[in-house]
A protein has these predicted regions:
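A general structural motif
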Residues: 1, 52-56, 90, 125, ...
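ATP-binding/phosphotransfer module of carbohydrate and carboxylate kinases, centering on a glycine-rich
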Residues: 1-51, 169-319
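Glycine-rich beta-strand-to-loop/alpha-helix junction loops that act as flexible
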Residues: 10, 57-63, 98, 133-135, ...
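Short, acidic Gly/Pro/Ser/Thr-rich loop/turn segments
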Residues: 14, 64-66, 136-140, 195, ...
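Short beta-strand-loop/turn "lid" adjacent to the catalytic site in phosphate-handling enzymes
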Residues: 49-95, 100-113, 265-268
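Active-site nucleophile and cofactor-binding loops and adjacent substrate-binding regions
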Residues: 72-75, 94-101, 120-123, 130-133, ...
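ATP-dependent carbohydrate kinase catalytic cores
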Residues: 92-123, 214-226, 233, 241
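Glycine-rich phosphate-binding loop of actin/hexokinase-like ATP-binding domains
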Residues: 116-183, 268, 274-280, 286
Length: 319
């Protein structure tokens, strides 16, 4: 089928892919600000790839998609799903959350599209979880049903932060006084890196020289600031503990995947961190989680791949 498109829409860019025989044929990226509406962007894409019209489409977008009216939180675009489908003369239009698309990409990823961290082998039919520290902390589960892979939506990034060591307690106390309640997102996100750094600085009686996560991670990777190194080191440890909790929540024997931009930017620092050690530090259940693999997603097009996987599953169900 060559009359299909998928889109991955963020606050800055929209990336679109033309589909032929169930595979991505061509990819184009545009600035969202180039177009007044998303319909204009999709129409321009069709012109650029020589496709007069599409029959099926799937849009993965970074905002809530529960209702017919979709309003982006980090851009001016808004649209009615039904009206957009009619405007583009589509038989089917599916609109899913961008993190749901990431989840749907996971069963399609090959070994060279991920970086495996630690031991464990995936059960191909086992439950899967993906989480992604970024601007916030997204969490999504996948489970295999007779109809195919189904996402289990939730707000896992907003569970309570559970301290595991003395440094965690220092961070928790600092944020508890500052925020009242400390969620996982307050330590596992861009601002989470800043929060950890600030807590360690205050505890050590040192000045808080940096308030940008990029500045802190840059100095941690370069090894030029001991407090920045300590903050990012603890960030990786906390991420491991959180990932282990997710694995236990739904027995994710199919693997735990890490998306979002932060972990991938940390690169070797993250791979060589104590992430996996903390992931397996589950007391009586250490033997269980040590058999669950953990992966860092290393595929820049995973949003498009996930939207495609979802679209193919939906068109198969209706045929």
């Amino acid at each position: 089928m060559s009359n299909m498109f998928v889109a991955d829409v963020g606050g800055t860019n929209i990336r679109l892919a033309q589909i032929e025989n169930g595979q991505i044929k061509a990819i184009k990226k545009y600035l969202c600000t180039e177009f007044d509406t998303i319909a204009e962007a999709i129409t321009q894409f069709g012109d650029d790839v020589g496709q007069d019209s599409f029959e099926h489409g799937c849009i993965a977008i970074a905002c809530p998609v529960n209702h017919d009216l979709v309003k982006m939180t980090n851009h001016t675009w808004q649209f009615s799903k039904k009206a957009l489908r009619d405007e583009l003369s589509l038989s089917q239009l599916h609109v899913i959350n961008d993190f749901s698309a990431v989840a749907h990409s996971l069963p399609t990823l090959s070994a060279d599209q991920v970086i495996k961290i630690g031991r464990g082998e995936a059960d191909p039919k086992g439950n899967i979880v993906v989480f992604g520290p970024g601007t916030g902390l997204g969490v999504e589960h996948l489970t295999l049903t007779a109809a195919g892979w189904q996402t289990l939506d939730g707000e896992g990034g907003h569970v309570d932060f559970a301290p595991n060591d003395e440094i965690d307690i220092v961070i928790w106390r600092y944020l508890k006084e500052k925020l009242g309640r400390v969620s996982a997102e307050e330590v596992l996100s861009g601002r989470g890196i800043v929060n950890i750094y600030s807590a360690l600085a205050v505890n050590a009686g040192e000045p808080e020289d940096y308030n940008d996560p990029a500045d802190i991670t840059e100095r941690a990777l370069a090894g030029t600031d001991t407090l920045c190194v300590a903050a990012v080191t603890q960030f990786c440890r906390i991420m491991g503990s959180f990932a282990g909790n997710l694995a236990l929540n739904l027995c994710t024997t199919g693997g735990v995947f890490i998306g979002g931009g932060i972990a991938s930017r940390l690169g070797e620092f993250f791979v060589n961190s104590e992430f996996r050690q903390q992931f397996e530090a589950k007391g009586n259940f250490a033997g269980y989680v040590e058999n669950i693999p953990t992966y860092l997603i290393n595929e820049p097009d995973h949003g498009l791949l996930g939207a495609l996987a979802y679209l193919l599953q939906q068109t198969k169900e209706t045929n």
